[in-house]
């Protein structure tokens, strides 16, 4: 039985597109990429020869290339094995690409069901219409995302401030012109397997001679498949990794150095990062007050603890949470509200640069619209420079002025956003755009669903 089980496991891994199956059977999950892990999960689901598979968010947080492969795999397995599949997802593009029928749920109840063609082109329920309108457009740039106002569980509207008298106004008044971030010849290699002799080490060139510049006040996108090096570049700029060689300058100050001089510390204060997962990036044991106050206390930007609380209260109001959130813990908030806390923490040091590393990939489309609109408002009001990392190409089109495409640690194209999406010059850029999930498989959406005017 053991040998038969091994043989079946090998066959299952081959059926889901995993090569070198005998060796892979002995590997651990952390040794697989995200796409390969998802293939293994699909193989596990097939092991019992089921008639029905339930796929719960099977492509969430996967880049467009891996997402397309997983969806194609699910479709082909359904045809070959005559399987039924229930896809649970917040990605309407996935539904458009794979499903025959769809049921839309809100507040625990099914509010609309029907053929995918019918639901996408002529939805009848207000919630379905709002969801479809909130999907970022990959074919057209709009000023704002259409938000679903009754979704996010208590988030207040964005509150504009009087920058002439507000402490955040100091950020705008102090914003210099010119290049905010300059990267020149940046390299980073990770050692995957250590060995006594250098020739026996296994290494990965995560960042390969990357050079780029981002202007003050610009929103700059970084896209690429998983493992392309985009998040590593962000972490190098933020000082979370140390580069092997190359230069990183923040408003002209070289920060690609190990020592922490006063100038480097001051430059780092100008830059803050919003991480991908709002569920793991916040300390579960800290109250929101202490989470947001941490950079204020670290950089000593308040004269007293009373002033710290006043600043935290003000920031929470500003991002739409309200002062009542101060004494709560992260587990008491929804995903979108937690990401607002992350944004509040990033603003607390009065930065001039925000690095947003996949800030909405863990959120559904309705909450995503709220967070992206908030980031747009903050950038416009405070004059922030943004480095926006995402594998979601429609989000990049809506959020960024220019885009760099990364592959295997190197930049293969930098262009204005509209130019990249309309006339990409590099074959890999065109490949990514071709893989982008589209909602208009059955024709263009009605004008009422085409996004905000």
Identify the meaning behind each predicted range:
Residues 246-257:
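Conserved ABC transporter NBD signature motif
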Residues 2, 118-123, 196-201, 255-272, ...:
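ABC ATPase NBD coupling module
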């Amino acid at each position: 039985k053991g040998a038969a089980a091994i043989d079946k496991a090998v066959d299952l891994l081959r059926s889901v597109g995993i090569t070198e199956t005998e060796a892979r059977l002995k590997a651990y999950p952390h040794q697989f990429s995200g796409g390969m892990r998802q293939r293994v999960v699909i193989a596990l689901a097939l092991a019992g020869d089921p008639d029905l598979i339930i796929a719960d968010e099977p492509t969430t947080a996967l880049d467009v290339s891996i997402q397309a492969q997983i969806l194609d795999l699910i479709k082909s397995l359904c045809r070959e094995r005559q399987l039924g599949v229930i896809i649970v997802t917040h990605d309407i593009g996935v539904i458009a690409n794979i499903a025959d029928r769809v049921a839309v749920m809100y507040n625990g109840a099914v509010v609309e069901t029907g053929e995918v063609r019918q639901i996408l082109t002529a939805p009848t329920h207000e919630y379905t219409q709002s969801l479809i309108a909130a999907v970022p457009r990959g074919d057209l740039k709009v000023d704002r995302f259409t938000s679903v106002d009754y979704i996010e569980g208590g988030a207040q509207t964005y509150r504009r401030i009087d920058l002439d008298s507000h402490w955040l106004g100091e950020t705008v008044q102090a914003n210099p012109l010119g290049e905010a971030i300059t990267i020149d010849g940046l390299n980073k290699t990770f050692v995957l397997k250590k060995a006594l002799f250098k020739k026996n080490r296994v290494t990965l060139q995560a960042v390969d001679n990357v050079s780029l510049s981002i202007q003050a006040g610009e929103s700059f996108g970084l896209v690429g498949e998983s493992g392309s090096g985009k998040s590593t570049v962000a972490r190098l700029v933020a000082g979370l990794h140390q580069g092997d060689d190359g230069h990183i300058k923040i408003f002209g100050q070289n920060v690609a150095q190990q020592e922490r001089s006063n100038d480097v510390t001051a430059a780092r204060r100008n830059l803050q990062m919003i991480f991908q997962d709002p569920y793991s990036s916040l300390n579960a044991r800290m109250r929101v007050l202490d989470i947001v106050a941490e950079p204020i206390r670290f950089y000593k930007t308040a004269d007293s603890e009373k002033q710290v609380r006043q600043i935290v209260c003000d920031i929470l109001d500003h991002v739409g949470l309200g002062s009542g959130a101060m004494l709560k813990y992260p587990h008491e908030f929804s995903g979108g509200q937690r990401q607002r806390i992350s944004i509040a923490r990033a603003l607390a040091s009065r930065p001039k640069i925000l690095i947003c590393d996949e800030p909405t990939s863990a959120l559904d489309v309705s909450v995503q619209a709220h967070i992206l609109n908030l980031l747009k408002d903050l950038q416009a009001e405070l004059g922030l420079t943004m480095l926006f990392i995402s594998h979601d190409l429609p989000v990049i089109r809506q959020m960024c002025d220019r885009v760099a495409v990364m592959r295997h640690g190197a930049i293969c194209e930098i262009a204005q956003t509209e130019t990249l999406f309309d006339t990409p010059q590099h074959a890999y850029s065109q490949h990514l755009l071709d893989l982008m999930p589209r909602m208009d498989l059955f024709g263009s959406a009605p004008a009422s669903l085409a996004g905000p005017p």
